[in-house]
């Protein structure tokens, strides 16, 4: 059933944790679920497709019930912060008005946007809405993900591709994407692209590696550093090819 389930939800409590973390009574849970939904909706609607990959909400301390800690993970922190923090202050003020509580707003930069499933799907949706060919969009997303250090990626686009009257699905994948392995760190996202021919569905699976005992997801998602050594070619002088500088390794 690994092929049919959401990989993020399937791994909760195993290698992943929840985006909302509370320390409350059972009677308060329904109201807080609705409040968290409205908080995320407000942040995402404030400026659509501003490269937000994750929104974490924490209410962990009993003494600070009237304070909510919100952490926004984004590839473009400058857009969220704004000039002199103007945009950040607006978001914080609207959240305070919505929840009637003190808001501690943190903004963290995503170091690897090319291998973060939500950001990859957002970029693909934007390109499809700009009428770029879907196969080119798929290939570009896969190439960038592998260049960023991903070990496997699968991309699925469904709908009226290229304006065809009959909807269909096109899948392209590279590398390993072990959906049945619960210790496999698989990032998943599903979004929609609104084109002139209708709505296209986009799904992205990215495999970062296996989380071994004693490790966390942060260990498998470290920024990729290339280990390749580049060798300079010989540089020749005008006197002839016999007079040259030996190649040196960096």
From Swiss-Prot:
<dbReference type="InterPro" id="IPR004087">
    <property type="entry name" value="KH_dom"/>
</dbReference>
<dbReference type="Pfam" id="PF00189">
    <property type="entry name" value="Ribosomal_S3_C"/>
</dbReference>
<dbReference type="GO" id="GO:0003735">
    <property type="term" value="F:structural constituent of ribosome"/>
</dbReference>
<dbReference type="InterPro" id="IPR015946">
    <property type="entry name" value="KH_dom-like_a/b"/>
</dbReference>
<dbReference type="GO" id="GO:0022627">
    <property type="term" value="C:cytosolic small ribosomal subunit"/>
</dbReference>
<dbReference type="GO" id="GO:0019843">
    <property type="term" value="F:rRNA binding"/>
</dbReference>
<comment type="subunit">
    <text>Part of the 30S ribosomal subunit. Forms a tight complex with proteins S10 and S14.</text>
</comment>
<protein>
    <recommendedName>
        <fullName>Small ribosomal subunit protein uS3</fullName>
    </recommendedName>
</protein>
<dbReference type="InterPro" id="IPR036419">
    <property type="entry name" value="Ribosomal_S3_C_sf"/>
</dbReference>
<dbReference type="InterPro" id="IPR004044">
    <property type="entry name" value="KH_dom_type_2"/>
</dbReference>
<dbReference type="InterPro" id="IPR001351">
    <property type="entry name" value="Ribosomal_uS3_C"/>
</dbReference>
<dbReference type="GO" id="GO:0006412">
    <property type="term" value="P:translation"/>
</dbReference>
<comment type="similarity">
    <text>Belongs to the universal ribosomal protein uS3 family.</text>
</comment>
<comment type="function">
    <text>Binds the lower part of the 30S subunit head. Binds mRNA in the 70S ribosome, positioning it for translation.</text>
</comment>
<keyword id="KW-0694">RNA-binding</keyword>
<dbReference type="InterPro" id="IPR018280">
    <property type="entry name" value="Ribosomal_uS3_CS"/>
</dbReference>
<feature type="domain" description="KH type-2">
    <location>
        <begin position="39"/>
        <end position="111"/>
    </location>
</feature>
<dbReference type="Pfam" id="PF07650">
    <property type="entry name" value="KH_2"/>
</dbReference>
<keyword id="KW-0687">Ribonucleoprotein</keyword>
<dbReference type="GO" id="GO:0003729">
    <property type="term" value="F:mRNA binding"/>
</dbReference>
<keyword id="KW-0689">Ribosomal protein</keyword>
<dbReference type="InterPro" id="IPR009019">
    <property type="entry name" value="KH_sf_prok-type"/>
</dbReference>
<keyword id="KW-0699">rRNA-binding</keyword>
<dbReference type="InterPro" id="IPR005704">
    <property type="entry name" value="Ribosomal_uS3_bac-typ"/>
</dbReference>
């Amino acid at each position: 059933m690994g092929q049919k389930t959401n990989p993020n939800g399937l791994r909760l409590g195993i290698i992943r944790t929840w985006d909302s973390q509370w320390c409350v009574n059972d009677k308060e849970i329904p109201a807080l679920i609705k409040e968290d939904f409205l908080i995320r909706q407000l942040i995402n609607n404030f400026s659509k497709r501003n490269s937000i990959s994750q929104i974490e909400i924490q209410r962990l301390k009993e003494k600070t019930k009237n304070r909510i800690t919100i952490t926004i993970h984004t590839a473009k922190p400058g857009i969220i912060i704004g000039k002199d923090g103007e945009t950040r202050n607006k978001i914080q003020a609207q959240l305070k008005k919505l929840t009637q509580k003190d808001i501690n707003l943190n903004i963290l930069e995503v170091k690897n946007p090319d291998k973060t499933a939500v950001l990859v799907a957002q970029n693909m949706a934007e390109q499809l809405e700009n009428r770029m060919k879907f196969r080119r969009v798929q290939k570009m997303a896969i190439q960038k993900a592998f260049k960023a250090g991903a070990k496997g990626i699968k991309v699925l686009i469904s709908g009226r591709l290229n304006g065809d009257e009959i909807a269909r699905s096109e899948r392209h994948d590279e590398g390993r994407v072990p959906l049945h392995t619960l210790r496999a760190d698989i990032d998943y996202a599903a979004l929609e692209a609104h084109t002139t021919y209708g709505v296209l569905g986009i799904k992205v699976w990215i495999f970062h590696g296996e989380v071994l005992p004693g490790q966390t997801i942060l260990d498998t998602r470290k920024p990729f550093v290339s280990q390749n050594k580049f060798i300079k070619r010989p540089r020749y002088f005008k006197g002839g090819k016999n007079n040259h500088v030996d190649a040196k390794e960096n």
